[in-house]
């Protein structure tokens, strides 16, 4: 198969977007600058992996690309030894990149920043023997990961490359960049040598694990407990050291994350590959293939793929559904997401038939391994589940950061605007892959069962198992979704909720998670499985329906049915499923457990029976609102609540409705009645005004108001009406008076005008006489100008102009011109001013 598998580097996008060079997956800069084949050219591997950037080998492209690509460029950290890691760090511009990655598993001393240098000796790493060293985890951000991813030959298949490391930054905290062995993330298949440091604590795998390029031995350190797994040992023989620490839990998310192998070499995939380097987040979980690590929270590693399935991502965090879809690890040609990430877009082409055969065999192993592993995980994780909830959530959050991409293929995409949301969300399955899937269903029906919605339904009953997180079934996640407030059963998806929101962990990625944990924006679907997404949507719809009902009840049901208050038991049940990890919500338990004692009768105001909504209450949306029983008034409860909780107020309305205090309800009722009474009064007034109805009738129409004051108000209103009538009468009288006065004024004005006219004529007649001028204030000297006028002297006018303000001023000139006694002085008066 290895011979058949051809690793093709596609120059599809020669230039990494946003300055990230497409690293051809095989070459990584050695500390001494020599390119090393990431695939760890295995003796057996016939794979010819060659990196061409624009046809030229780029041995050291990674470091420079990495700097830009990811502030978490863990890339260079894939070093054989810690010293080498430092050297690689030197090459790596970003000190974070320098974080010694435990994935130094390249025999060749690949210093390349690939965290997940899944150097599978092509044969050693059978599809079944996919080994992932968590340290080797690709730092997708650094894109050295893409170079590693660049080529997964089936033999050299990075199939189980630990991409958790790819989801670095947080994983780094874990020591392996986000290499959470998802609760012993994957059981390495019988042949698989996956070194996972499930615990983020084990920052570096033992040099052996880094050196164990052979898939045969990779050290999985969980909480620094190392179990060396012989890749050839059957998975059951593999000893996992479970320390009850986050490491185990980390595996859980990864199971959810299950790297989906992009089987198709589709051009879109390739473009996607070119883009993935763009994802500056090393967090790109390879793949787009990663489901949110939380998807099952518990799908621990029961890798449906199993190492036998050479999932390019060394451990498919394998939601069974994810496994389904991505799941022919390399059916036909598969582009590993990591490969996609590598700008080289190296795709592993594998003979679908060979893969199918191997896959079938591997599946048998996987099934066995998954069962045994699951049982182990169930036992260990039952213990760890609690640990997980207490401590793992933090890790989960780190996983979310770890996979700003892992959790959300989408979040990764958003954090890096460079990535297509849809592509990252979806694994594309070639028909070959589909056929492999079918085989897988045949070979491992129990795993696929989990993928089926029916299994999901079954999973509902398995809440305990879900709590055990060891459950690898996506269905269990879904059951949790509906049944539990813990991690959203679809932790990969919708119910990520606040604990999954940890964008802080993903330095690069802002998780576009809905605060409600409904879904990452962009509707991230589990890779290849849409059933779970449907379940999520169904849950959401159910919650929304409950919301609507409650809203209606609040607004419309003034007559509050006296329902029994929510039982504390129910609240407690909800609490049980709340992740204690969610620090934000931990105080909620207190609220939940509070009896509604302060409500003194609030129970009578429940809008609807709590049971009606209770099945929704267990959904993630209702996960924690402390509001239900908070003694605060319904409106007061909003005041200090976090935004997402405030939203939950609406989501959990049925639960929150209890919050309405008796006083609040009374006020509401009073307000309503007051409004009604006012409206009725207005109506009555209108009737009275029109005379269409009598006060008595109107009073009867009024509802008996709870307030005894209404009767008095009615009488007062009558008095007011009488006063209004009186005022109207007065107004009418005044109007009449006004009209009379206006008439009088008009007549007086006419008379006055006539009088003025008469006076004017009188004045005109007598202005000719000198005595008439004396009253006008003209002194005898005026005669001199008047006499002068006879002499033809017109200069008498200026003194007259001084008096132009008075009519007499014009009259004097007329007088001056009066030499012609027979003439009216009007003409002369006009001449004078002229």
From Swiss-Prot:
Signal peptide: none
Coiled-coil annotated spans: 712-749
InterPro entries linked: CCSER (IPR029627)
Biased composition (Low complexity): 497-507
Comp. bias regions, Polar residues: 192-212, 781-790, 804-816
Annotated spans, Disordered: 169-212, 426-454, 477-509, 573-628, 695-714, 780-834
GO biological process: microtubule bundle formation
Keyword set, alphabetical order: Coiled coil, Cytoplasm, Cytoskeleton, Phosphoprotein
Recorded GO CC terms: cytoplasm; microtubule cytoskeleton
Keyword Endoplasmic reticulum: no
Basic and acidic residues: bias regions: 426-443, 573-584, 601-611
Residues modified as Phosphoserine: 223, 452
GO MF terms held by the record: microtubule binding
Compartments where located: Cytoplasm, Cytoskeleton
Disulfide bonds, paired cysteine numbers: none
Entry's family note: Belongs to the CCSER family.
Role noted for this protein: Microtubule-binding protein which might play a role in microtubule bundling.
Name of the protein: Serine-rich coiled-coil domain-containing protein 2
């Amino acid at each position: 198969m290895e011979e058949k598998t051809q690793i093709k580097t596609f120059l599809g996008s020669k230039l990494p977007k946003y300055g990230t060079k497409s690293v051809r997956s095989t070459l990584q800069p050695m500390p001494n600058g020599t390119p090393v084949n990431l695939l760890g050219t295995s003796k057996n591997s016939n794979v010819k992996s060659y990196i061409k950037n624009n046809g030229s080998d780029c041995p050291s492209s990674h470091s420079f690309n990495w700097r830009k690509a990811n502030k978490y460029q863990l890339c260079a950290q894939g070093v054989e030894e810690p010293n080498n890691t430092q050297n690689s760090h030197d090459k790596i511009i970003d000190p974070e990149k320098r974080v010694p990655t435990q994935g130094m598993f390249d025999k060749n001393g690949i210093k390349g920043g690939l965290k997940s240098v899944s150097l599978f000796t092509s044969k050693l790493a059978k599809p079944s023997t996919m080994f992932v060293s968590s340290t080797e985890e690709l730092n997708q951000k650094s894109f050295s990961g893409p170079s590693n991813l660049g080529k997964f030959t089936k033999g050299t298949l990075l199939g189980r490359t630990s991409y958790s490391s790819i989801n670095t930054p947080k994983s780094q905290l874990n020591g392996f960049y986000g290499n959470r062995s998802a609760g012993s993330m994957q059981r390495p298949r019988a042949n698989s040598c996956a070194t996972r440091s499930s615990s983020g604590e084990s920052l570096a795998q033992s040099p052996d694990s880094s050196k164990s390029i052979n898939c045969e031995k990779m050290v999985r350190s969980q909480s620094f407990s190392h179990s060396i797994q012989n890749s050839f040992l059957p998975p059951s023989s593999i000893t996992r050291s479970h320390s009850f620490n986050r490491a185990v839990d980390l595996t859980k998310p990864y199971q959810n994350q299950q790297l989906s192998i992009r089987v198709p070499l589709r051009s879109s995939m390739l473009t996607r590959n070119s883009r993935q380097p763009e994802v500056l987040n090393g967090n790109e979980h390879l793949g787009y293939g990663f489901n949110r690590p939380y998807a099952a929270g518990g799908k621990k590693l029961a890798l449906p793929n199993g190492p036998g399935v050479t999932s390019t991502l060394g451990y498919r965090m394998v939601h069974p559904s994810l496994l389904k879809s991505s799941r022919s690890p390399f059916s036909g040609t598969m582009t590993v997401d990591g490969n996609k990430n590598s700008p080289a877009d190296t795709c592993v082409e594998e003979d679908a038939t060979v893969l199918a055969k191997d896959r079938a065999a591997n599946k048998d192993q996987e099934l066995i391994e998954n069962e045994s592993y699951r049982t182990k995980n169930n036992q260990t994780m039952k213990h760890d589940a609690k640990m997980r909830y207490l401590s793992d959530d933090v890790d989960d959050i780190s996983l979310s950061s770890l996979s700003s991409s892992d959790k959300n293929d989408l979040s990764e995409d958003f954090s890096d605007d460079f990535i297509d949301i849809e592509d990252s969300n979806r694994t594309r399955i070639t028909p070959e892959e589909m056929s492999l899937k079918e085989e897988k269903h045949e070979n491992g029906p129990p795993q696929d069962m989990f993928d089926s919605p029916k299994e999901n339904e079954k999973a509902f009953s398995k809440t305990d198992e879900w709590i055990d997180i060891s459950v690898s079934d996506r269905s269990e996640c879904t059951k949790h979704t509906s049944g539990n407030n813990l991690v959203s059963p679809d932790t990969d998806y919708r119910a990520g909720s606040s604990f999954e929101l940890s964008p802080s962990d993903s330095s690069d990625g802002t998780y576009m998670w809905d605060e409600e944990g409904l879904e990452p924006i962009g509707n991230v679907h589990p890779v290849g499985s849409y059933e779970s997404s449907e379940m999520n949507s169904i849950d959401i719809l159910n919650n929304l329906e409950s919301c609507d009902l409650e809203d209606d009840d609040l607004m419309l049901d003034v007559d509050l049915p006296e329902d029994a208050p929510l039982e504390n038991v129910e609240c407690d049940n909800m609490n049980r499923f709340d992740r204690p990890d969610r620090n934000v919500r931990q105080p909620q338990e207190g609220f939940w457990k509070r009896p509604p004692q302060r409500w003194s009768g609030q129970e009578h105001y429940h809008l609807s029976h709590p049971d009606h909504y209770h099945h929704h209450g267990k959904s993630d949306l209702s996960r924690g609102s402390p509001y239900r029983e908070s003694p605060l008034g319904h409106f007061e409860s909003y005041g200090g609540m976090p935004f997402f909780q405030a939203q939950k107020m609406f989501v959990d309305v049925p639960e929150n409705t209890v919050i309405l205090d008796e006083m609040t309800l009374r006020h509401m009722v009073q307000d309503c009645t007051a409004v009604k009474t006012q409206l009725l009064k207005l109506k009555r007034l209108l009737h009275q005004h029109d005379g269409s109805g009598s006060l008595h009738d109107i009073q009867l129409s009024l509802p008996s108001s709870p307030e005894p004051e209404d009767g008095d108000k009615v009488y007062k209103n009558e008095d007011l009406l009488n006063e209004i009538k009186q005022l109207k009468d007065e107004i009418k009288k005044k109007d009449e008076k006004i009209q009379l006065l206006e008439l009088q004024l008009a007549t007086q004005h006419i008379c006055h005008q006539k009088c003025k006219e008469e006076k004017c004529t009188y004045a005109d007649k007598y202005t000719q006489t000198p005595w008439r001028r004396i009253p006008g204030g003209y002194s005898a000297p005026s005669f001199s100008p008047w006499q002068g006028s006879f002499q033809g002297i017109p200069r008498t006018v200026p003194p007259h102009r001084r008096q132009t303000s008075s009519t007499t001023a014009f009259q004097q000139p007329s007088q001056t011109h009066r030499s012609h006694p027979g003439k009216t002085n009007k003409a002369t008066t006009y001449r004078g001013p002229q």
